[in-house]
Regions:
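Helix N-cap at the start of a conserved alpha-helix in ABC-type nucleotide-binding domains
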Residues: 100-102
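Conserved catalytic motifs of ABC-family nucleotide-binding domains
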Residues: 85
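Catalytic Walker B motif of ABC-type/P-loop ATPase nucleotide-binding domains
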Residues: 89-92
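Hydrophobic anchor residue at the start of the ABC signature
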Residues: 78
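Conserved ABC ATPase "signature" region
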Residues: 34, 45-60
């Protein structure tokens, strides 16, 4: 078991984007970011501004988050996860409830972050959106890894789940 100081070190390196998003609807986007920045011990608006730029949002963010589109909410949630400049991102369903254009824009942002050296883990039911942007795909079933590949192959394709079942190739 990690000691509390080691655990804090690990946590400081991880950014988490929850599903559903952990944002306060009555607060503006900037107020949300300032609030969460304080929880990380970050003062001033510079890190908030950097997080906003990283997800390509309007820097003003004066409207209450409750008035944002789903795409903007997801970007805000990602900005929140980036506040402390983590090395690792854990993203839970980042494309849920967003239109295809917004999802593709987010994939582009994630690819830029990956290229900048961040390690990104995405949990999604829309893995096809990450085709060409992910280094590895891992499929899980009942908590077990059932497939790993360097490219996206739908589980119901000839090289997907059916092939695994017929050939007995499982990582269980």
């Amino acid at each position: 078991m990690l000691g509390s100081s080691k655990l804090r070190e690990v946590c400081d390196q991880v950014g988490y984007m929850a599903h559903p998003s952990l944002l306060y609807d009555e607060m503006s986007g900037m107020e949300n970011l300032r609030y969460f920045a304080k929880l990380y011990g970050i003062s001033g608006d510079e890190r908030c501004a950097q997080a906003i730029r990283a997800v390509a949002l309007d820097p003003a963010l004066t409207r209450p988050v409750g008035q944002y589109s789903q795409g903007m909410r997801q970007r805000m949630s990602l900005a929140r996860a980036l506040l402390h400049d983590p090395k690792i991102l854990l993203l839970d369903e980042p494309f849920s409830n967003v239109d295809v254009r917004s999802a593709r824009e987010m994939v582009g942002l994630l690819a830029k972050m990956r290229d900048a050296g961040k390690t990104i883990f995405v949990v999604t039911h829309q893995a096809g959106l990450l085709e060409g942007a992910a280094d590895e795909f891992v499929w899980m079933e009942a908590g077990l890894i059932v497939r790993r590949t360097g490219e996206f192959v739908p589980m119901d394709s000839p090289a997907g789940e059916g092939a695994r079942l017929h050939t007995g190739e499982a990582s269980r």
